[in-house]
């Protein structure tokens, strides 16, 4: 059985969030929390919140053992881009793309043996 949590339209660039997601993919939940707490990236607290939600979903919805959970899937997709303009010299303007992410974490119980 799998439990899933998704954070949609999070205001962090997918490229930056993927750096942190790659650190925890395939790890046990306790180990993943430790990694996230000691990773000095802006995406760490956001991903920790999504992981906490996935663990809570596993415990509440599927009666899984929290101490026996492993992250089976973790990925970041691109969300909608907010387009802004920055005024430049001589009346020009340049585009600023504020990128957003959809962060998905799937946890399941560890296989016995």
Swiss-Prot record:
Pfam families: Ribosomal_L22. Keywords: Ribonucleoprotein, Ribosomal protein, RNA-binding, rRNA-binding. One of its GO terms (molecular function) is structural constituent of ribosome. GO terms for cellular component: cytosolic large ribosomal subunit. InterPro entries: Ribosomal_uL22, Ribosomal_uL22_bac/chlpt-type, Ribosomal_uL22_bac/org-type, Ribosomal_uL22_CS, Ribosomal_uL22_sf. One of its GO terms (biological process) is translation. Signal peptide: none annotated. Belongs to the universal ribosomal protein uL22 family. This protein binds specifically to 23S rRNA; its binding is stimulated by other ribosomal proteins, e.g. L4, L17, and L20. It is important during the early stages of 50S assembly. It makes multiple contacts with different domains of the 23S rRNA in the assembled 50S subunit and ribosome. NCBIfam families: rplV_bact. Part of the 50S ribosomal subunit. HAMAP family: Ribosomal_uL22_B. This is Large ribosomal subunit protein uL22. It comes from Geobacillus kaustophilus (strain HTA426). The lineage of its organism: Bacteria, Bacillati, Bacillota, Bacilli, Bacillales.
């Amino acid at each position: 059985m799998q439990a899933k949590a998704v954070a949609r339209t999070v205001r962090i660039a997918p490229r930056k969030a993927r750096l942190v997601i790659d650190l925890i993919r395939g790890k046990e939940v306790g180990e993943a929390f430790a990694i996230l707490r000691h990773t000095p990236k802006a995406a760490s607290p956001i991903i920790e919140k999504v992981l906490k939600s996935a663990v809570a979903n596993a415990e509440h919805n599927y009666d899984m053992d929290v101490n026996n959970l492993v992250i089976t899937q973790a990925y970041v997709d691109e969300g909608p881009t907010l387009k802004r303009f920055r005024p430049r010299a001589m009346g020009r303007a340049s585009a600023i793309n504020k990128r957003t992410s959809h962060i998905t974490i799937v946890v399941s119980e560890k296989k016995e043996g």
